[in-house]
Regions:
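Conserved beta-strand positions in repeat-built beta-propeller and related beta-rich domains
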Residues: 10, 26-30, 66-81
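A short beta-strand motif characteristic of beta-propeller blades
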Residues: 2-9, 42-47
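Inter-blade boundary loops/turns of WD-repeat beta-propellers
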Residues: 29, 38-39
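Extended beta-solenoid/beta-helix repeat architectures
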Residues: 29-32, 51
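Repetitive beta-architecture junctions, highlighting loop-to-beta-strand starts
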Residues: 2, 32, 82-87
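Beta-rich, blade/repeat-based domains predominating
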Residues: 7-21, 50-63, 67-71
């Protein structure tokens, strides 16, 4: 495997990627937002999610699926955190 290109991430803690025809979907563990970028790294859109401590993402069937880590020391807790891992 060979690295052919790197792009700047639109977020501080990228923790999930999914490439689609619409661009690269990047899950941010810190903000729980999903950022969609093109192949140059240009931000196309930001999608707020109800995810808590996001750790994974996939896109399909017209849906955006994310997963939560549950409790973590990776970022400060928020009042909306459940402390549970869920999809």
């Amino acid at each position: 495997m060979k690295t052919v290109k790197q792009i700047e991430t639109p977020c501080e803690m990228p923790n999930g990627l999914q490439w689609t025809d619409d661009g690269l979907f990047v899950m941010d563990q810190k903000t729980d937002n999903v950022y969609v970028v093109d192949e140059t790294g240009k931000l196309l859109r930001t999608i707020p999610t109800p995810t808590a401590n996001g750790s994974g993402i996939t896109v399909g069937g017209g849906f955006l699926w994310t997963t939560s880590n549950g409790n973590s020391v990776s970022r400060p807790s928020r009042s909306t955190d459940t402390g549970l891992g869920y999809i």
